[in-house]
A protein has these predicted regions:
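Nucleotide-state-sensitive switch-loop elements of NTP-binding domains
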Residues: 6-7, 65-98
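Short, charged/polar "capping" segments at the starts of alpha-helices
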Residues: 54-59, 82-83, 166-169
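Phosphate-binding/switch loop-helix module in NTP-utilizing enzymes
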Residues: 84-141
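Substrate-engagement module of ASCE P-loop NTPases
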Residues: 139-165
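Short glycine-/polar-rich loops that comprise or flank the Walker A/P-loop
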Residues: 15-17, 42-44, 68-70, 154-155, ...
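Glycine-rich P-loop/Walker A and Walker A-like loops and their local beta1-loop-alpha1 context
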Residues: 1-61
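Short, aromatic/basic amphipathic alpha-helical patches
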Residues: 58-67, 169-176
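Phosphate-binding/switch region of NTP-binding enzymes
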Residues: 155-156, 161-184
């Protein structure tokens, strides 16, 4: 049974989970930062998969909110697609495109294995962007695969999706793969 709630406080105290966070566009940035800050402030290291914003932009945004990025490994799947300059970074893996689900999967595996602690998170931003590059059925299969991997890795898994009418059926289907659904 999926726990439903309207606050990220529903995640506090849970050791491992797969959470689907459905966010209004106006709260998207602040919600993402709030979730990450909460995890990092609990001394939980993790992986941030970005399909929306380049690594440098995310780092700058996090620094402005005093989020310690030393505990985060980034996977950036947008900088190359947007034609940005790629410089080798010790805390970031660059992927060619949000369309390349195999590369995203391999990178997540590598990044999670790099974190030596038992307690860790994987933050996937965002399902909505994945749908711009991939068919709905492909995305549903990928999220099913991803939720399974999150359970195998025993992480705190968060999958972000924008609240959009056209994604309603998919969100309902994906709820079955998750432990918690947050309406934010």
């Amino acid at each position: 049974m999926v726990k439903k709630g309207s606050s990220i406080s529903k995640l506090k105290g849970l050791k491992e989970y797969v959470a689907l966070a459905v966010v209004n566009a106006g709260k998207y940035k602040s919600t993402n930062m709030s979730i990450i800050k909460n995890l990092v402030d609990q001394d939980t290291p993790g992986v941030y998969v970005s399909l929306n914003l380049p690594y440098n932009t995310i780092k700058k945004n996090f620094s402005a909110k005093k989020i310690d990025t030393s505990k985060i490994i980034f996977i950036d799947a947008i900088t190359k697609t947007a034609g940005g300059k790629i410089e080798k970074k010790k805390d970031c893996l660059f992927i060619g495109s949000p369309k390349n689900l195999s590369d995203i999967s391999v990178s997540m595996d590598q990044a999670i294995m790099e974190i030596p602690t038992k307690d860790k998170f994987l933050f996937f931003d965002s399902l909505s962007t994945l749908l711009l590059y991939n068919d709905v059925k492909v995305v549903a299969k990928f999220v099913h695969f991803l939720s399974g991997k999150m359970r195998v890795w025993k992480v705190k898994g968060i999958i972000i999706s924008l609240r959009r009418k056209e994604d309603k059926d998919l969100i309902e289907e994906l709820e079955t793969f998750c432990d918690v659904k947050l309406d934010l």
